């Protein structure tokens, strides 16, 4: 419990909550609550919060007393004195203040200025994750938690790979937030062809992608070690053999429980892809999917039992939801409307459809700048060089868009990537294929509170259905331009989508994801 209660209230607060002034009319408050489906609005005077108006206030102090809603001002309705909490205080402090004052919401301030709102519902979400984990933790006779050691089989930094980045965040989060449950982790790193890396010290064993004997040696190392459970990060392309079939030789030989995270689940697999994934399923005690749609595919297409499949969302960083203007200045973009897409570049990303959509967007908004962030995928670069990037550059030039498109051709450190996202007005995901079951870029865009325009690939379908993203059609520049122009022309829709994206991401932040994984590791061990 301590790991959660010691987090700052900023972890789960709603940033940029809706505000009104004390002299605004109660009718305006009611309109806003109805339009945006919100239960409270902060009252601000001279940039300082002075009260809060809730749905209960409106019912008891206006409607019940039969006041004229067109003549009643907010000052006569709001709850005061206002109870606030400083952003640096802990969730434990927030819970105590809510209980002491018998309230469900706390206005969060920094040096007296409004920075957010923390709600009972938000605290319940993080508490739910904690208690799920607590129920699985085994307490030994001396009343300490039975700590386990996990081996992670995956690519690792400094290798430039999305799976490597994901694994680093997962490992770091389990160390940071589950210290009473896990011991120092063990890394088993997947090397690409000809790739040798200066790994951090937690990497104790390495597998050369095309050397079948190195898979066997890695299994021997794991079996002889004090590792309790193995987490395998599975993506076809990081393992050797046809469709990465060498991973089965590794799994066959591991004598410890295995929890496998599936980054790709094909709904219409070719025979070799089916064979390999069926082997992974056979030799795994549990498998994790990041989108709930993956659970149905595994049961329906691969015949995997439902009890074996667990849903844990793709993790995301816990960052502040800030106005884009604050970050745009640091990039010299204060006069631009910024669209962006990030990730390792390859033809499967569909960037060309956004470029094709730009003329219709630029016609209405000539200040548009589309940022294409990320270098070409290293494996693609080995096989094809910069063919795809050059294709995109040629397309930009042929459409006369050189002033409206900028390539950031680097693998960015996380803090710089987040800054670019915070400077983004609309984040676009134009994936051309439906079968994408997980997307780190989608998770990051949600975590920074972006208004998102995305094609309905499997992971995105769930986000769209929850009102946290706007759907555009596959391979359809006209659909993309229509969605972007709609958001830019209607600030209310844009702001509502942005807030919903941020709120949706709160259950996906790394502390929650780490606890879910540790909970599953204990379950795999029968604890």
Can you say where each PLM-predicted feature lies in the sequence?
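Conserved acidic donor-binding segment of nucleotide-sugar-dependent glycosyltransferases
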Residues: 466, 470-477, 486-491
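The conserved cystathionine-beta-synthase
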Residues: 19-37, 44-45, 84-102, 108-110, ...
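Acidic donor-binding loop of glycosyltransferase active sites
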Residues: 404, 419-436, 450
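Nucleotide-activated donor-binding/catalytic signature segment of Leloir-type glycosyltransferases, i.e.
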Residues: 384-411, 415
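Tandem CBS (Bateman) regulatory domains
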Residues: 1-16, 54-99, 114-146
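Conserved donor-binding/catalytic core segment of Leloir-type glycosyltransferases
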Residues: 333-349, 355-358, 370-373
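Donor nucleotide-sugar binding/catalytic pocket of nucleotide-sugar-dependent glycosyltransferases
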Residues: 282-322, 333-334
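Short hydrophobic beta-strand element within catalytic cores of glycosyltransferases
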Residues: 446-447, 451-454
């Amino acid at each position: 419990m301590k790991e959660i209660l010691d987090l700052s209230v900023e972890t789960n607060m709603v940033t940029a909550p809706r505000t009104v002034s004390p002299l605004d009319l109660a009718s305006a408050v009611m309109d806003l609550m109805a339009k945006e489906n919100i239960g409270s609005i902060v009252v601000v005077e001279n940039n300082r919060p002075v009260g809060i108006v809730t749905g209960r206030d409106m019912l008891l102090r206006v409607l019940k007393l039969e006041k004229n809603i067109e003549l009643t001002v907010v000052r006569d309705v709001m709850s005061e004195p206002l109870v606030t909490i400083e952003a640096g205080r802990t969730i434990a402090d927030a819970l105590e203040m809510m209980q002491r004052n018998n309230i469900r919401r706390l206005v969060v301030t920094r040096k007296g200025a409004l920075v957010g709102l923390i709600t009972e519902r938000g605290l319940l979400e993080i508490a739910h994750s904690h208690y799920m984990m607590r129920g699985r933790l085994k307490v030994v006779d001396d009343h300490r938690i039975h700590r386990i050691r996990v081996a992670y089989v995956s690519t690792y930094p400094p290798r430039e790979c999305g799976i490597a980045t994901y694994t680093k965040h997962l490992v770091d989060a389990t160390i940071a937030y589950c210290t009473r449950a896990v011991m120092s982790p063990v890394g088993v790193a997947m090397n690409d062809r000809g790739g040798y890396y200066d790994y951090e010290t937690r990497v104790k064993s390495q597998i050369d992608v095309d050397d079948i004997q190195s898979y066997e040696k890695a299994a021997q190392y794991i079996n002889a070690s004090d590792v309790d459970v193995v987490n395998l990060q599975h993506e076809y392309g990081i393992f050797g053999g046809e469709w990465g079939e060498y991973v089965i030789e590794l799994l066959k030989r591991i004598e410890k429980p295995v929890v496998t995270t599936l980054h790709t689940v094909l709904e219409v697999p070719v025979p070799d892809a089916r064979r390999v994934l069926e082997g992974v399923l056979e030799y795994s005690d549990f498998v994790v999917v990041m989108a709930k749609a993956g659970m149905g595919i595994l049961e329906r297409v691969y015949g995997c039992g439902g009890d074996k499949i667990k849903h844990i969302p793709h993790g995301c960083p816990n960052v502040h939801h800030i106005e884009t203007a604050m970050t745009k200045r640091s990039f010299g973009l204060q006069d631009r409307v910024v669209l962006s897409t990030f990730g390792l570049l390859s033809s499967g990303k569909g960037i060309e459809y956004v470029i094709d959509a730009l003329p219709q967007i630029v016609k209405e908004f000539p200040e548009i700048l589309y940022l294409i962030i990320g270098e070409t995928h290293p494996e693609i670069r080995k096989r094809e060089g910069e063919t795809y990037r050059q294709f995109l550059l040629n397309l930009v030039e042929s459409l006369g868009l050189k002033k409206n498109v900028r390539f950031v051709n680097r693998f960015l450190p996380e803090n710089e990537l987040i800054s670019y996202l915070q400077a983004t007005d609309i984040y676009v995901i134009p994936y051309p294929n439906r079968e994408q079951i997980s997307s780190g870029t989608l998770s990051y865009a949600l975590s920074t509170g972006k208004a998102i325009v995305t094609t309905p690939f499997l992971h995105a379908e769930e986000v769209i259905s929850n009102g946290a993203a706007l759907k555009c059609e596959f391979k359809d520049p006209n659909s993309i331009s229509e969605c972007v122009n709609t958001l830019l022309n209607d600030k209310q829709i844009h702001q509502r989508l942005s807030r919903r994206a941020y709120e949706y991401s709160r259950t996906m932040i790394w502390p929650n994801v780490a606890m879910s994984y540790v909970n599953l590791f204990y379950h795999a061990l029968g604890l």
